[in-house]
Amino acid sequence: MVRGAFGRLGRLVRHRLFQVLVSLAIGAALLWLAIARIDLAGLGAELAQVKPSWLVAAVALYWVALMLRSWRWRILLAPVRALSFGQVFHGLLVGYAANYLLPARLGELVRADLLGRRYAISRLSIVGTIVVERLFDVVVFIGFIFAGLAALHSTGDSRIGPILHLVELVAIGCVVLIVLLLVLIRLRHKPLPRPIAFLEKRLRALAAGLHLITGAQEVALLIAATAIVWTADTVTYWLLAYSLNAPLTLLQLFLVMGMSCLAALIPAAPGNIGALQYALVLAFQLLGLPGVTGFSLATLAQGCCIAGSTLVGGGLYLLAALGNARTRPKLAEPPVP
């Protein structure tokens, strides 16, 4: 039995190590491709001209956007369990830190597990709220890409085709997911066929997290919350670009946001290093702007915004882990003879 447990642990470690190595390789390859597309000598000069006041404003708004995301997630969690803003914000920061540090966006499961353990909530119900949250985000991402492509002077660029094909695949996946969620909601109070009856409890727990997409009023509330969240995110990127003396028009900004979202779908290195650089270099070059500015924008976003929230989220997780270790009951010591 012990040997079997160690065998399973070994396979899990190897699997996780393989995921990390693959993500690092993808990030390194994309970073190399991004560097190959720009004048690397001009990168230092580009970053040296950053306007500090605009950069500070961008970082401040980035944290406001994170708070707004916590507010939206709290709305989604309300039918499952009423939590304070601080409790939700803590979970979101830890989850986002894990997303930036771990491959395959495992941070979504980390925040579900954290809130589930801490507040005795079904993890599947929390996962259901995260699925809804990300579904609304994907719809925004698709809108960004299609609106942003309208900013291009030439639609005959051969680089546009692969982007559109990828967005189409994401859109198809989004539609399939919506259909599956609607089916799950309809079946949540009905007994399942005997072969899959063992899943009934789990599926109902998952469906509990989908409660807010069952009514028009609730969907309208989520649309409004998502619009506010993404407005803050979009203005953050505009401020970062402006700090680099690169004021973007609205349609140009939409393409940049869409490409940054596309980069987030790639299981690349921690902090999305490489993927974000390549995506924004490509976006700026499609817009007829210097690719080095896109590279600088990605680097600023990672170094000044993402790194800060990752450090805070990681610190909160470590503090919680240390607190749990201290409060864990100790085993009784045997009496001294």
Regions found by a protein language model. Name each.
Residues L109-L114, V127-I130, V140, A225, ...:
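Hydrophobic alpha-helical membrane segments of integral membrane proteins
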